[in-house]
């Protein structure tokens, strides 16, 4: 009988599962998720289930975060190759017999409908971090070329669907790993300089490049039109330019302190398109103004800085590269979303992390934060 009463309480048994968790990271995620719930309640006023579903998605993502945080980084490393191979295989399957919606072939029916490109947001940094860990201490230019090939294949398959937003996120995650692995600035500078020059040329020659009948190589027609609309939204104010114009109106009308919670006229009169998903930042800006935006941006900056600290303090090269790449995913998500809503980047369909509605994206974010927690936890357990 004594053995029965000597059993530790449920709290004591659960405590080790939370030991080593990174408090500042959890706090940043909690604040951003709370802001997401707040603005979802307002922007989804005519879809009562949207707020409930968003909360459910957060709970699912939180559970996934907790589970992944219990997996040691060395086990994550062992999963890198299988996850990458499965992800690329599913992308090939999508290209052959995927489901087409609105002109894009991005989904696959495997009993349930899935979007395999989401897997690559996690699989790509895992795979490249594994590759450079295996080559640690003997890196050669050829190793960076192999890493580039591992990156280009899935990015090319995703762009072919077409899905520019997801391909940008996967590309950013992969390039972050390659950069943190020690790629020479001599190789980084030329494409960056050429990219900047290219952007200036596009802006300078916009009237000629965006004239009727002109087609750009590489990009799909709708992608070209998005760039041209960004440069001059007034060319189609009720069509392709409507999103950008209404987003900028909402942001500007918020002023310094906003119109108040549930008082956004652009939002509640339904002028803002996709106000619970891609353009939720416009709804947030209208109701909470510049002050609210600065607080939200500060939350993302804190999250990103904390992720970089975890990366720098990680015990192994694999953990450092993975944490750095995951942190870059957060940065790319936030920068691209806020940029496109503000009219400084083309509309590419990238959600705002922890704020926008979307189950798949929320699960991906849960996986990403879980991996950061795993790396931070491993470091703390080693220190203790």
Please place each PLM-identified region on the residue numbering:
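N-terminal membrane topogenic signal
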Residues: 12-29
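Hydrophobic alpha-helical transmembrane segments of multi-pass inner membrane proteins, especially
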Residues: 26-243, 282-342, 367-371
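Re-entrant/interfacial helical elements at transmembrane boundaries that shape
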Residues: 169-170, 246, 263-268, 299, ...
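Long extracytoplasmic/lumenal interhelical loops at the membrane interface
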Residues: 248-291, 311, 318
């Amino acid at each position: 009988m004594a053995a029965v009463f000597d059993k530790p309480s449920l709290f004591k048994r659960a405590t080790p599962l939370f030991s080593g968790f990174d408090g500042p990271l959890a706090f940043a995620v909690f604040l951003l998720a709370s802001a997401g719930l707040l603005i979802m309640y307002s922007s989804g006023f005519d879809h009562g289930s949207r707020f409930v579903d968003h909360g459910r998605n957060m709970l699912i993502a939180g559970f996934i975060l907790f589970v992944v945080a219990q997996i040691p980084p060395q086990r994550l490393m062992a999963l890198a190759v299988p996850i990458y191979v499965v992800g690329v295989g599913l992308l090939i399957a999508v290209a052959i017999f995927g489901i087409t919606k609105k002109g894009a072939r991005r989904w696959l029916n495997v009993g349930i409908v899935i979007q395999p490109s989401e897997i690559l947001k996690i699989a790509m940094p895992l795979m490249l971090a594994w590759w450079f860990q295996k080559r640690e201490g003997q890196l050669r230019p050829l190793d960076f070329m192999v890493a580039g090939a591992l990156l280009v294949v899935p990015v090319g398959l995703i762009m072919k669907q077409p899905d520019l937003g997801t391909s940008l996120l996967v590309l950013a995650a992969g390039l972050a790993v390659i950069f943190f692995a020690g790629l020479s600035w001599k190789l980084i500078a030329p494409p960056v300089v050429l990219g900047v020059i290219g952007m200036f040329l596009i802006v300078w020659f916009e009237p000629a490049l965006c004239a009727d009948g002109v087609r750009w190589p590489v990009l799909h027609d709708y992608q070209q039109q998005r760039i041209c609309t960004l440069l001059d939204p007034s060319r189609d104010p009720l069509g392709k330019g409507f999103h950008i114009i209404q987003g900028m109106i909402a942001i500007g009308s918020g002023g310094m302190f906003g119109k108040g919670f549930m008082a956004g006229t652009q939002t509640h009169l339904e002028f803002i398109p996709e106000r619970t998903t891609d353009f939720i930042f416009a709804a947030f800006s209208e109701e909470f103004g510049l002050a609210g935006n600065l607080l939200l941006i500060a939350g993302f900056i804190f999250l990103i800085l904390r992720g970089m600290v975890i990366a720098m303090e990680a015990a192994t090269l694999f953990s450092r590269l993975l944490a750095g790449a995951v942190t870059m995913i957060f940065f790319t998500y936030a920068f691209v979303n806020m940029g496109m809503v503000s009219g400084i980047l083309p509309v590419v369909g990238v959600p705002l992390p922890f704020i926008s509605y979307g189950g798949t994206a929320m699960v991906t974010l849960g996986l990403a934060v879980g991996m950061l927690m795993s790396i931070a936890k491993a470091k703390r357990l080693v220190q203790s």
